[in-house]
Amino acid sequence: MNRLIILCLVAATIYSTIALPMKEDISNEERPTSVNEKPVKKSVAVAGAVIQGAALAFQVLDKILTSLGGIGRKIAIGVDNESGMKWAARNVYFYSGTSDTVLPYSVPHSKAFLYGARKTRGSVRGAVGVLAYSMSDGNTLGILFSVPYDYNWYSNWWNIKVYRGYKRANKWMYHDLYYYARPHKGNNEWHEKSLGYGLKSKGFMTSSGQTKLEIRVSRA
């Protein structure tokens, strides 16, 4: 009788092992994409960002212009730092217009900063101003952008200059870059010049009211 009971228990154990399926082992690679999908990275092509200098292109500036909305006078700026130095933002001076973007603070060598500006809504003035960056050699890089409201009287202009010592962008710097320091017309052409202090620049500015300005600063 005991042997019969034991045989019944053994048979029941074998049956349960066969009848119950083994728990499925789903590896990480085999899981549905809804479980394992990676978050989509946001584009870095936005005003206020710092990107690889080699990635700076007009397509990047086009995205910034789009993000600024349907404003008649606006500008997307990209400046590549190939100077061998680190830059730190000082400030922005606006002769006219404004920006919703914080000027990127730290721009290491081989990086480029992106910035956007526009005319003030409801005004009949353009987007005109100066950016200032202090460089690790103790000097300041001043950058002019000028996108006028009335193209019957004015044109697009840009400029770049190295100032000795630490300077802030202000009305004096604007007047110097716009009137006296050999500014470049925004005429859809590349312009190059020596900046002194072992540096040179190469830049391109479009001529329309939705303006792109790309500048590369490198060692001479």
From Swiss-Prot:
Localization annotation: Secreted; Nematocyst; Target cell membrane
Region described as Trp-rich region, which is important for the binding to lipid membrane: 146-161
Tissue-by-tissue expression: Expressed in tentacles.
GO molecular function, one term: channel activity
Positions of the pro-segment in this chain: 20-42
Motif (Cell attachment site, crucial for protein stability): 185-187
Signal peptide bounds: 1-19
Site (Important in the initial contact with the lipid membrane) residue list: 154
Gene Ontology biological process terms, A to Z: cytolysis in another organism; monoatomic cation transport; pore complex assembly
Site (Interacts with the lipid membrane): 201
GO cellular component, one term: other organism cell membrane
Gene3D superfamilies to which the protein is assigned, alphabetical: Cytolysin/lectin
InterPro entries, A to Z: Actinoporin_PFT (IPR050677), Anemon_actinoporin-like (IPR009104), Cytolysin/lectin (IPR015926)
Pfam assignment, any one: Anemone_cytotox
Key words of the record: Cleavage on pair of basic residues, Cytolysis, Membrane, Nematocyst, Secreted, Signal, Target cell membrane, Target membrane, Toxin
Binding site for phosphocholine: 96, 128, 146, 148, 174, 178-179
Family: Belongs to the actinoporin family. Sea anemone subfamily.
Its biological purpose: Probably acts in predation. Pore-forming protein that forms cations-selective hydrophilic pores of around 1 nm and causes cytolysis. Pore formation is a multi-step process that involves specific recognition of membrane sphingomyelin (but neither cholesterol nor phosphatidylcholine) using aromatic rich region and adjacent phosphocholine (POC) binding site, firm binding to the membrane (mainly driven by hydrophobic interactions) accompanied by the transfer of the N-terminal region to the lipid-water interface and finally pore formation after oligomerization of monomers.
Domain statement: Composed of a long N-terminal alpha-helix and a core region rich in beta-sheet structures. Before the pore formation, the alpha-helix binds the lipid membrane, partitions into the lipid-water interface and stabilizes the monomeric molecule on the membrane. Finally, it traverses the bilayer, thus forming the transmembrane pore.
Quaternary data: Octamer or nonamer in membranes. Monomer in the soluble state.
Name of this protein: Deep-sea actinoporin Cjtox I
